[in-house]
Regions:
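Active-site-adjacent segment of SDR/Rossmann-fold oxidoreductases
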Residues: 109, 130-140
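Active-site loop immediately N-terminal to the catalytic Tyr-X3-Lys motif
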Residues: 63, 109-115
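C-terminal helical subdomain
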Residues: 144-145, 152, 161-200
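Substrate-binding pocket helix/loop in short-chain dehydrogenase/reductase
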Residues: 61-62, 69-71
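Residue(s) in the substrate-gating loop at a strand-loop-helix junction
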Residues: 104
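The beta1-alpha1 cofactor-binding region of Rossmann-like NAD(H)/NADP(H)-dependent oxidoreductases
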Residues: 3, 24-35, 67
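Active-site helix of classical SDR
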Residues: 85, 120
Length: 200
C-alpha cells in the first residue's frame, strides 16, 4: 500500500525502469485497482499477467474476533481478489492473459482461531475456481495457488533461519513462472504447495 515499498520492490526486480515500475494500491479500494491497471496500460500498452497476492491474517477465537477484524480480512483477502480481477478483466480479455490468486491451504483446511481467515480463503478458492470456468471462453487462464507455511513478513513474522523449513518466496516465484511457461492448452487450475518436511 506504500509507494516507497512498491518502488523498492521494483528496484530489486530491475534497475531498468522501462521494464518495471511500482504502483501503490489498496486492494480494498476498487478505484485504486482501476488506477493501477490504467497506469500499467499507459506504460506498457497491455496487461498479460495478474497475480492477486495481498493478504491479512488475524487469528483469534470467533468469540474474541471483532467485527472490524472480520471485515478487514474479508475486504483484503476476498474482496481484494474480486477488485483486482474486476479491474483487470477487460485488458485480460484483449491479451488472452493469465490471472493467478494466491490463496492458502487454509482455503480448504479449517483450524482453531482461524474462523475469519478460513472464511476469507475458502471464499478466494471458490471465487477463483468459479471465475476460471466463467473466463475460459475468452481464453483467459485462471489459477489458484494454495501455499502452506511461507517464510515472509506476513502477520508480523520476521523471517530467520528458524523458517528455513518453510516454503520460501522464491519457491512460489518459480512456480508462477513455470505455470506461465506451460503450453497454453494446459491449465493447472488449482495447485497446493506445502513444505516438503514438517516443522522441525
Amino acid at each position: 500500500r506504500k509507494q516507497e515499498d512498491a518502488e523498492e520492490a521494483a528496484r530489486i526486480l530491475s534497475e531498468d525502469d522501462s521494464k518495471v515500475f511500482g504502483i501503490a494500491s489498496d486492494v480494498k479500494n476498487f478505484e485504486d485497482e482501476k488506477t493501477a491497471v490504467s497506469e500499467i496500460i499507459k506504460k506498457f500498452g497491455r496487461l498479460d499477467y495478474v497475480i492477486a497476492n495481498a493478504g491479512l491474517g488475524i487469528f483469534k477465537p470467533v468469540d474474541e474476533l471483532s467485527l472490524e477484524e472480520w471485515n478487514d480480512m474479508i475486504d483484503t483477502n476476498l474482496n481484494g481478489v474480486f477488485h483486482t480481477m474486476k479491474a483487470s478483466i477487460d485488458e485480460l480479455k484483449k491479451s488472452e492473459g493469465y490471472f493467478i490468486s494466491i490463496a492458502s491451504l487454509a482455503g480448504t483446511n479449517f483450524f482453531e482461531k482461524g474462523s475469519g481467515y478460513n472464511a476469507s480463503k475458502f471464499g478466494v478458492v471458490g471465487f477463483t475456481q468459479a471465475a476460471m470456468i466463467d473466463l475460459r471462453k475468452y481464453n483467459i487462464k485462471v489459477s489458484t495457488i494454495m501455499p502452506g507455511s511461507v517464510s515472509t513478513y506476513f502477520n508480523g513474522n520476521e523471517p530467520s533461519d528458524e523458517d528455513s523449513w518453510k516454503i520460501q518466496p522464491e519457491d512460489l516465484g518459480e512456480l508462477v513462472v513455470d505455470i506461465f511457461k506451460m503450453n497454453p492448452r494446459a491449465l493447472p487450475s488449482k495447485i497446493e504447495i506445502r513444505p516438503s518436511k514438517p516443522t522441525s
